[in-house]
Amino acid sequence: NESKKISTLSDDVDDRIYGSDIIADALREQRFPYICLNPGASYRGLHDSLVNYLGNHTPEIVTCMHEEHAVGIAQGYAKVTDKALAVAVHSNVGLMHASMGVFNAWCDRVPMLILGATGPLDAAIRRPWIEWIHTAIDQGSMIRGFTKWDDQPASPEAAVESIRRGVMLANTAPSGPVYVNLDVTIQEQKIETRQNLGDVAHFSSPEDAEPPKK
């Protein structure tokens, strides 16, 4: 429903208490209609916020059976709209599944925001075995050779800037996929005081350069 008001980070809302809520709101302010994902525990906090905080709209979850499918849908969306779509892939294993699709998007020069997750990076609070094998110190290195940019923010507030900057870079010609990796800990961090994170307009993509004159 286009008449429904879409909240943004600049709205005065008091009930956001987890880092994943702030991160989900950063996706909403980009006006992503969908986020394509294969569910995984590494971004359980963000998944919860997409459903229970945002109400599963703007973005709406598109559940995929494989990470390469999720990236392929985002590639097709970008081919039609010339705009980035959001994708979420689980930890190191999901990123490895997605990697061939990310490479295709890179070769096709299409914009895409890929959200990953890992951790907890703090080994003292990891669950036995499963969170050890799904944690990587430099997860972005797996696709760094065929993405425009990647980041691993250390706080929810930094994650907002990473998403804003990543979308700007993805949509700026020559377009390409970007990757933002979210530690489990910052997703589940309780937010006591909400900071003013500034205007998203400061991260607008520049106009395409003029073609060379003959």
Show which residues each predicted segment covers:
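N-terminal alpha/beta PP-like core and its mobile active-site loop of ThDP/TPP-dependent enzymes
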Residues: N1-K214
